[in-house]
């Protein structure tokens, strides 16, 4: 029987609004090359070196911690193509999308540093931009724009990509927090020593004047007022 004109549609909700699905048995990924000489930015705790991988034992990020086929943790390292991206993906990650100025405790910047590393040789990474995601069979909203409750599911995709593409050395996507830049996550078991070369000393986000000025500039652009540590 034909539906009545104007009747509400009974079609299922769009796949774009569904939770992150499990990765299929066979993935169709697109690999791209990160060129030699590319400089990447990182924000991390000052107790770690600029090119030091997270051992992957604990944490709760979109693509880490993850394990290989033998249940062993895969070391990971996150980076971005700009300092803005690195700051937005770390210390400003949870700033709410509310109008007007928001306050941010300066104490949250303590112990955080900005580092840069240069890629010493080309690296092959899985491209998670919108076009290759269509071939992969998942939407950006399901994989990259989810909230934290979906992180266990998004990590399954990182594990599956690592398992099925033995030449993949990491993942690359348009940053959710700063869509003018690219974010990266590298697989530590596939990045030889010396490939990520630190460029100069790491800079404290609080104690280094130039680094703090850059943080203040970004804070103003996202409507954040940095207040003294409580």
What annotation goes with each model-predicted range?
Residues 2-65, 97-230:
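Active-site and NAD+-binding cores of ADP-ribose-processing enzymes
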Residues 65-98:
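Extended catalytic/binding region for NAD+/ADP-ribose chemistry, centered on the ART fold
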């Amino acid at each position: 029987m034909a539906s009545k004109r104007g009747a509400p549609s009974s079609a299922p909700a769009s796949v774009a609004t569904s939770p992150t699905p499990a990765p299929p048995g066979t993935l169709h990924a697109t690999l791209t090359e990160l060129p030699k000489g590319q400089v990447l930015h990182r924000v991390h705790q000052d107790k770690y070196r600029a090119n030091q991988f997270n051992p992957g034992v604990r944490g709760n990020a979109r693509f880490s911690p993850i394990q290989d086929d033998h249940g062993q943790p895969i070391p990971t390292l996150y980076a971005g193509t700009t300092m803005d991206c690195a700051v937005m993906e770390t210390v400003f990650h949870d700033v709410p999308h509310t109008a007007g100025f928001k306050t941010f405790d300066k104490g949250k910047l303590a112990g955080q540093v900005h580092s840069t590393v240069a890629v010493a040789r080309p690296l092959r990474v899985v491209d998670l931009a919108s076009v290759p995601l269509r071939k992969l069979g998942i939407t950006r909203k399901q994989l990259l724009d989810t909230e934290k409750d979906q992180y266990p599911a998004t990590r399954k995709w990182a594990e599956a990509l690592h398992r099925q593409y033995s030449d993949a050395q990491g993942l690359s996507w348009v940053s959710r927090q700063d869509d003018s830049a690219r974010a990266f996550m590298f697989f530590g078991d596939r990045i030889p020593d010396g490939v990520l070369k630190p460029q100069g000393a790491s800079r404290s986000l609080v104690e280094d004047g130039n680094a703090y000025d850059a943080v203040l500039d970004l804070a103003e652009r996202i409507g954040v007022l940095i207040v003294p540590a409580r």
